[in-house]
Amino acid sequence: MIKKRFISLSALIVLLLVITGCGKDDDVQEVIYEKGLPKEDSPAFKEFMRYELGLARDATLSYQDHTYTIMRSDVDGLRYYQYTDEELRDFYSPLFSAKKDLSHTLYDLQTTEFLNKEKLIQNKIEHNLPEMTLDKKNVLNVKTKSGEKKIELPSARGKKVILALEAVRKDNMLIQVIINGKTGDSQTYYLFIKQDLSKHQLVKEDGLHTTLESGKLKDYLSVFPKVTEDGAYLKLFDNYIFEEETNKVRKIKDTDILSEDGKYVYINGAKQEENFVISDGIQQIQTVDNYLKGNKKYEAQFKLDFKNISNEMGFKTPGVSSASIHYFNEDYVVLSLSYHGVMVGTAGSVNVLIDLQKNKKQPTAYLVDLGIE
């Protein structure tokens, strides 16, 4: 009798687990598919355009009163620019008026100079931006409103030095220093320096994490963007987060993707199956806080179906040949999908623009070929 009760109870538990599991999956809704671009502009689309036009890849030093201040650094030197939301939106507005060949329209925008001389900041000091110069011996001279400071760079004499201002705050600055040798070798340093020029610290790139964890850079932490309002987490370079409470550098898994702003994680967003294809089905996004705590709280959950997307596009195909996340930021995800032809070749390609601004449980996915691979 006891044995029968035990078997019955076990069967009931298994049944409840199955029902509960199915229920959770059933609660996750598939995205709403729409062909073409969004009908109107939005803050999240604007940030996506900044990325596509190469503006977000430059160091964004500030965004205030609808105005961006950015730094661009290359072999020609270091320059500062300012542009407004309105100027940016006017620049990419042809995308919304184009009736066809959107990929060509985007390409034309990408190959047209947006950062012209009119947007160049001439008086750096007045804009609270440092002037940085190198003498013939590659000694760095930094000039701010507080004065000037000369800093000798290690093993830089006779080599090509590239400077990049990564961040500027009220109290601190962060300068990237790349020293290129004549034989093709290079060494990257990070120069942390006080705005009043009272002190500085130079750290090798490969020693940045250990130096952070040692506490030696405690006075300079403001140069790293806050991931959370309380500053419990700070965004470092690449897929790394600094946790202030534990004084530890945390790494986002290689199979997951950190958003451009460093605040969200796309679970398994970089976990590609065979032939460079990420999985469709349930997609999950967490805040960095929840991700690092290891819980199951999700900021967004929704379903994607690659077959349904091909049907919407009218592709005759046995399935996807490649599928990857091209762009991920707060409230916006952009995928690049390519489909096999029935026998050989390609049936077609499409970009999927998932807009999470209004609905994170059933977002709208815009299907459009922007030529983004």
Named regions from a protein language model:
Residues G158-V320:
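Acidic, serine/threonine- and glycine-rich low-complexity intrinsically disordered segments
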